[in-house]
Swiss-Prot record:
Organism: Shewanella piezotolerans (strain WP3 / JCM 13877)
Matches recorded under NCBIfam families: PRK05330.1 (NF003727)
Binding site for a divalent metal cation: 98, 108, 147, 177
Domain of life: Bacteria
Protein's cellular compartments: Cytoplasm
Signal peptide: none
Task of the protein: Involved in the heme biosynthesis. Catalyzes the aerobic oxidative decarboxylation of propionate groups of rings A and B of coproporphyrinogen-III to yield the vinyl groups in protoporphyrinogen-IX.
Name the record gives this protein: Oxygen-dependent coproporphyrinogen-III oxidase
Site (Important for dimerization): 177
Top EC class for this record: oxidoreductase
Pathway, per record: Porphyrin-containing compound metabolism; protoporphyrin-IX biosynthesis; protoporphyrinogen-IX from coproporphyrinogen-III (O2 route): step 1/1
Catalytic reaction equation(s): coproporphyrinogen III + O2 + 2 H(+) = protoporphyrinogen IX + 2 CO2 + 2 H2O
Length: 304
């Protein structure tokens, strides 16, 4: 088995952050990212980049972080008790994009690497990540192209890879209290290490590099679509689901807060504007109703 090398992972993640920021700036055409570098007292730090007030993107955040500590937090050891008593190193790129136009979906992506050491034993390490799409208005073409891109990047890694990580994504981004998915899914993987460092790293890179390939065509198709106050209000209402998931269920958010991570960077995923409405029910036969009935549940999008 190849030896895990965190330095090559870090170099890739920094390059990925640059590439994604450059790609998003090109899509927006007006706004640019502002960088905020930070250090963590217990060890490590990161670079938070945020674009606000763009022509296409209301807010887009692309974070790189590399943190270390003497012991793993409860959020990490809960499902991996063998990590207790080990020092750790965690690094990743995480992004969330909230567009202005309700016809462009919100999206999230993350790729990460963990390694935990204890003197006299082999390190415990794994990769994780994925990307997912949260549309406000139902465009089957966009959802299918998103999943086609996800499947294509998985194909070199085996026929079972896409269905496995697609299913995991549907299960992870589920809001039990709403009985609905956060969006239309994509890929989600974690604890990836069984095939050795090199192959696992290859897959993580494929997911990171595949994100813009999947998302950019959707932005291009929808960015000139006209919308009014009704669509905007529905977008703001549905953004509430994003807030609910991230603050109640998301493991990455919990890990960051429990490890004393930088709060501004962790909560960068929050939409700049959001609204809740008591007992909202979409009008029968409307596009909003179609989102609820046809899109907020796990489906095999590539067989429709």
């Amino acid at each position: 088995m190849s030896i895990p090398d965190s330095s090559v992972v870090k170099a890739f993640l920094l390059e990925l952050q640059n590439n994604i920021c450059n790609g998003l700036e090109a899509l927006d055409g007006v706004a640019s990212f502002k960088e905020d570098s930070w250090k963590r007292e217990e060890g490590g730090g990161g670079q938070s980049r945020v674009l606000t007030g763009g022509k296409v993107f209301e807010q887009a955040g692309v974070n790189f972080s590399h943190v270390m500590g003497a012991s793993m937090p409860a959020s990490a050891t809960a499902h991996r008790p063998e990590l207790a008593g080990r020092n750790f190193e965690a690094m990743g790129v995480s992004l969330v994009i909230h567009p202005n136009n309700p016809h462009i979906p919100t999206t999230h992506a993350n790729v990460r690497f963990f390694i935990a050491h204890k003197e006299g034993t082999d390190p415990i390490w794994w990769f994780g990540g994925g990307f997912d799409l949260t549309p406000y208005y139902p465009y089957l073409e966009d959802v299918v192209s998103w999943h086609q891109s996800a499947k294509a990047l998985c194909e070199p890694f085996g026929d079972e890879t896409y269905p496995k990580y697609k299913k995991w994504c549907d299960e992870y981004f589920w809001l039990p209290h709403r009985n609905e998915t956060r969006g239309v899914g994509g890929l989600f993987f974690d604890d990836l290490n069984k095939q050795g460092f090199d192959k696992s790293f290859d897959f993580m890179q494929a997911v990171g590099n595949g994100f813009l390939t999947a998302y950019a065509p959707i932005v291009e198709r929808r960015k000139e679509t006209e919308y009014g106050e009704h669509e905007r209000q529905f977008q703001l209402y549905r953004r509430g689901r994003y807030v609910e998931f991230n603050l109640v269920y998301d493991r990455g958010t919990l890990f960051g807060l429990q490890t004393g991570g930088r709060t501004e960077s962790i909560l960068m995923s929050m939409p700049p504007l959001v609204r809740w409405e008591y007992a909202y029910i979409p009008e029968a036969g409307s596009p909003e109703a179609a989102l609820y009935s046809d899109y907020l549940k796990p489906r095999d999008w590539l067989s429709l």
